[in-house]
Design a protein with these regions (language model features):
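Short glycine/serine-rich loop segments
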Residues: 122-164, 174
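Basic nucleic-acid-binding alpha-helical/helix-turn surface characteristic of O6-alkylguanine DNA
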Residues: 1-122, 169-203
Length: 203
């Protein structure tokens, strides 16, 4: 019981206003461990309870450095460079999410590309499953991963409509993705003659 209480006391959360709306951020120490957009405080507590099995403690505001890094990331100033806690995930899930963090703003990749990049070329479906369990959407931008046929696919942070909104916010027109796929502009990880596909900016 003592260990449970200590864990509970170690997970805290607070809201931050962003260009996309109110974002709730949970953290352990200086590491972000869960985020959700457009929720309310009680709803976010339930999200954390599903992920960690506990409810976090609410703070009035995020630590200043953490809030600045979150806002810089969401406004495109710089990629989030703060600490992220993925310790509750499997090694495969962590590999997938770390690779996702390297996808630049305004670009997309396919599930197949991610699978190949982490050395599991036939595991595109498992990549999708790992992304569905992403506890830190936006900061780990799983919305930038789409199907090889140009369709958006699912999104753990609120479904395809939210995914489309996030891509549009970053300058990607979701309606163009199918056309771009027909021109091989969505990186799939498949090899062409003479070398590998290179990821190409969508814009």
């Amino acid at each position: 019981m003592k260990a449970v209480k200590e864990t509970l006391n170690n997970v805290r959360y607070a809201p931050v206003s962003t260009p996309l709306g109110r974002l709730y951020v949970a953290y352990r120490g200086k590491a972000v461990c869960c985020v959700a957009l457009g929720s309310d405080g009680r709803g976010f507590e339930r999200v954390c309870e599903r992920v960690f099995g506990i409810r976090p403690i609410r703070d009035p505001r995020l630590p200043e450095d953490m809030a600045k890094q979150v806002l810089d990331h969401l406004t495109g100033r710089r990629r989030f460079s703060g600490r992220i806690d993925l310790s509750h995930l499997t090694p495969f899930q962590r590999r997938v999410l770390r690779k996702i963090r390297t996808i630049p703003t305004g670009q997309v990749r396919s599930y197949q590309w991610v699978a190949k990049e982490i050395g599991a070329e036939r595991a595109a479906r498992a990549v999708g499953t790992a992304l569905a369990k992403n506890p830190i959407p936006l900061l780990i931008p799983c919305h930038r991963v789409v199907r090889s046929d140009g369709r958006l696919g699912e999104y753990s942070g609120g479904g395809p409509s939210v995914k489309a909104k996030l891509l549009a916010f970053e300058g990607v027109d979701p309606e163009d993705l199918t056309r771009l796929r027909s021109r091989r502009k969505i990186a799939t990880g498949r090899r062409r003659k003479g070398g590998a596909d290179r990821p190409v900016p969508v814009a």
